[in-house]
Amino acid sequence: MEKAIQRQRVLLEHLQPIRHHTHDHSSSLTTSICAAGDSAAYQRTAAFGDDVVIVAAYRTAICKSKRGGFKDTLSDDLLAPVLKAVIEKTNLDPKEVGDIVVGTVLAPGSIRAMECRMAAFYAGFPETVPIRTVNRQCSSGLQAVADVAASIKAGFYDIGIGAGLELMTVDNIGRVQQRNTKVDTFAQARDCLLPMGITSENVAQRFGVTRLEQDQAAVNSHQRAAAATASGKFKDEIIPVLTKIVDPQTGKEKPVVISVDDGIRPNTNLTSLGKLKPAFKNDGTTTAGNASQVSDGAAAVLLMKRSVAMKKGLPILGVFRSFAAVGVDPAVMGIGPAVAIPPAVKSAGLDLDDIDLYEINEAFASQFVYCQKKLNLDPEKVNVNGGAMALGHPLGATGARCVATLLHEMKRRGKDCRFGVISMCIGSGMGAAAVFERGDAVDDLCNARVSNNNSFLSKDAK
């Protein structure tokens, strides 16, 4: 933490107006290092009110596709409750929202865009509030949040919503229908068409991730998710959804309220997982038990300028600090987080040691284990409430879901947890990561403004 404070002190000196004093030019932190790294960065400023902050982040429960709680729910009815929640729970006038961006993957783009627009109307938004979708596959929900943060930072609007939605009960993972003959002459293009399970096997084989390591990761995920559920942690982030369940035999509809993740198996153990056969290769190590679940779910995140949140008296859940998207070899797309996290952390002016919590999507245990080992992460900081192997992975919603899970956990931990990272691999060979700061983690070295009446920095300066 001392290193982080020193970096922030030097950073603020770079960003302050020129004064008649000098600072230590021998510092290892320079303006070039402070600037955004690689291809993506989120510039800090010394203007306290210029921070992009999160004031609300909620999700639905995550349910098993085709047989879970949302199997008979329409996509627009799944998205509407979380859009409504971020407005109602903050008492925000919906007409003040500048844009809504929804990450979504599998449904045809134009159809899903209309469904999202319909959901906004159900949630109480007026016709004047626009909405669009974004698709960067498994990172789509996080990309939506990053897009809104960037738009607020650019001054396009002051308030926006980044959301995510996937109804895998209805929208199945598709395949390219008309294969281009050129693809066989471009190895990486060909590998974009590999089934995700085969890329998992490639990671396990290339980097020596064993079946036992993968199964143990799955056990840990289920145990942590079960413990979080039992302790009531997820109640802070889950919005109950009133929907229906249709009896497949009689067709009779039964009204239900879905408020608990239904994919968690508390009794998962190495013995039971060890009996499962490989799902993609006869001699493989990836099984139905150590891969993410196919799921239905939605999530929404309300972002705004800090100055707007302060004016409205809204509590600040988190601060959006940086974002990075990177490309990797499509044949081992699962390594994406190991490549994306370092530049995202660097862009925030931090080191990996400064990060207190991680939410890394568990697309497959093979890639999850590899990324932890590659970055030498403390397992006690990663997916402390379980991940996609236990909760499920509704593709477009996962990134936004992780924002809700991470920020509520950081809030619970308080002063001992300042910075958090969300990351995931992306089909066709990419990775994405974002850095967040706990909302109340402000001091004279962070998010401060220069007081005109005093010679010191104060977060309360006018």
UniProtKB/Swiss-Prot annotation:
UniProt GO cellular component terms: peroxisome
Record's keyword annotation contains Cell inner membrane: no
Keyword Nucleus attached: no
Location in the cell: Peroxisome
Binding of substrate, residues: G427
Regions that span the bilayer: none
Catalysed reaction equations from the record: an acyl-CoA + acetyl-CoA = a 3-oxoacyl-CoA + CoA
Keywords: Acyltransferase, Peroxisome, Transferase, Transit peptide
Annotated pathway: Aromatic compound metabolism; Lipid metabolism; fatty acid metabolism
Mutant phenotype after disruption: Strongly reduced benzoic acid (BA) levels and lower benzenoid formation.
Gene3D superfamilies in alphabetical order: 3.40.47.10
Coiled-coil parts of chain: none
Entry protein name: 3-ketoacyl CoA thiolase 1, peroxisomal
Species annotation: Petunia hybrida
